[in-house]
């Protein structure tokens, strides 16, 4: 099969998958109590497996092998994709498929700590991806708007924008519970999680598959096999969806509180007149903030209630890191600093969002590390090819905020770090010589057509709170667009 034919087969498979997902999502949305009893055949459907394979192969982790040593490339070069998927489908249907343990890999995180990743085999990743294609549209119908992490069409900027919206005038939710869950992905209770999954999934074969992946075990870096009696391994394709299913218990609880997001404007106003608090939750995966229009005592009381809610899922709040903060003091959330300040030159106060100091330190450390890794024996062009994308990507994330001052400061620090690198490279050269060689007589390093990226020249924007208008990937418009691309229907004439 040539490339054009294989692309058309994949596009038609994606069209079929999208059509079925749209139906599943609509049925789940229209009937909140519906349990889906025949989903396994979709997991083993050739179209779902092909789309799942394509997503696994296109992921940057495709070159990383699990405990069986196989990669996506080795499968293509060996038995071939067609035979691989046929064999996998047969194993699923005759129930001989068994997930293998994930391979443990420890990666560094901030503060010198390590994060455990679980690397599944390519075969297991394909099955997990197919499971996600089937389950995600169903559970997305239940997830509330306050949840943003690992969800389609949603991003961290949406969560930050909502938090800014809620703490700004005229809403002014001023007290904030900054939530921190201890080892969230490692401690989720399997029975509690399966209970929540089972509210929507009645197919015992699908439930068995999900449970098998949870119980697959971990092959440690010391080659010791450990059981997994709790948690969802970070790094697995299913883990983000399952963690959202577990943490939706928190979303549902806050939504149902008197004064919560389901309360009407009139009800919230009446509660405030009687000195009662109102609440809103903003969550991105296991990072969450509960904002309260009330008093600190109201925030403290609700923190204890939330600890009880999370305990039903086997989770614990960190007493040291779960803080109660006033918006005047500010808080860090998803890399951003969110704080109320007086606007310069006026007596008015506004809530601003800008890069947190921790985020700034992180990118400056990245710049220093790259300058150490790219030795002075290499060219300035080699350094800029590594350095520019890192700084540009950081600035792109923080562009929608009040980040101009931070960008200007970062630009100066990047410039001085690169200049120190050039001075080490040419220890006997004068400033004048270096400027003539690398800056065309100016001060900003450039080699050929590549110049050092200047954060100070990045314009800032405002990312607006989208509220409940965030589009669904399973809308009729998205389905029609895919069908046109696959040649299954004619494009409308305008």
Each language-model region and where it sits:
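Non-catalytic terminal/accessory segments
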Residues: 1-494
């Amino acid at each position: 099969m040539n490339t054009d034919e294989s692309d058309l087969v994949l596009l038609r498979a994606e069209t079929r998958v999208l059509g079925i997902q749209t139906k599943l999502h609509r049925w789940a949305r229209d009937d909140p109590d519906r349990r889906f009893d025949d989903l396994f055949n979709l997991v083993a459907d050739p179209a779902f497996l092909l789309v799942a394979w394509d997503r696994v192969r296109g992921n940057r982790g495709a070159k990383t092998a699990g405990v069986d040593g196989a990669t996506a490339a080795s499968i293509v070069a060996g038995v071939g994709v067609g035979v691989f998927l046929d064999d996998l489908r047969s194993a699923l249907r005759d129930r001989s498929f068994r997930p293998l343990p994930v391979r443990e890999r420890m990666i560094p995180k901030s503060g010198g700590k390590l994060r455990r990743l679980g690397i599944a085999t390519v075969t297991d990743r394909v099955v997990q991806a197919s499971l996600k294609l089937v389950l995600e549209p169903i559970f997305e119908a239940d997830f509330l708007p306050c949840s943003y992490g690992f969800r389609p069409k949603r991003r961290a900027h949406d969560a930050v924008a909502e938090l800014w919206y809620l703490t700004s005038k005229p809403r002014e939710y001023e007290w904030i519970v900054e939530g921190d869950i201890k080892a969230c992905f490692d401690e989720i209770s399997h029975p509690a999680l399966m209970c929540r999954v089972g509210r929507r999934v009645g197919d015992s074969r699908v439930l068995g598959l999900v449970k098998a992946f949870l119980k697959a075990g971990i092959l440690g870096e010391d080659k010791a096999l450990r059981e997994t009696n709790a948690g969802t391994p970070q790094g697995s394709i299913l883990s983000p969806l399952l963690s959202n299913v577990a943490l939706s218990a928190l979303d549902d609880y806050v939504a149902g509180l008197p004064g919560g997001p389901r309360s009407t404007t009139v009800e919230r106003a009446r509660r405030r007149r009687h000195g009662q608090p109102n609440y809103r939750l903003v969550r991105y995966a296991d990072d969450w903030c509960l904002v309260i229009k009330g008093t600190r005592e109201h925030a403290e009381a609700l923190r204890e209630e939330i600890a009880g809610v999370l305990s039903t899922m086997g989770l614990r709040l960190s007493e040291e890191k779960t803080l109660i903060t006033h918006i005047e003091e500010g808080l860090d959330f998803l890399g951003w600093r969110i704080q109320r300040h007086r606007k310069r030159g006026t007596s008015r106060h506004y809530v601003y969002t800008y890069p947190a100091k921790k985020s700034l330190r992180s990118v400056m450390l990245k710049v220093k590390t790259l300058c150490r890794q790219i030795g002075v024996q290499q060219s300035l062009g080699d350094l800029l090819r590594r350095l520019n994308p890192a700084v540009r990507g950081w600035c792109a994330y923080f562009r929608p905020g009040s980040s101009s001052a931070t960008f200007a400061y970062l630009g100066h620090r990047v410039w001085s770090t690169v200049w120190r690198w050039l001075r080490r490279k040419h220890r006997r050269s004068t400033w004048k010589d270096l400027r003539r060689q690398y800056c065309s007589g100016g001060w900003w390093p450039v080699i050929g057509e590549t110049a050092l990226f200047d954060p100070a020249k990045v314009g800032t924007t405002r990312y607006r709170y989208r509220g409940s208008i965030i589009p669904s990937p399973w809308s009729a418009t998205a389905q029609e667009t895919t069908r046109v691309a696959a040649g299954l229907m004619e494009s409308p004439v305008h």
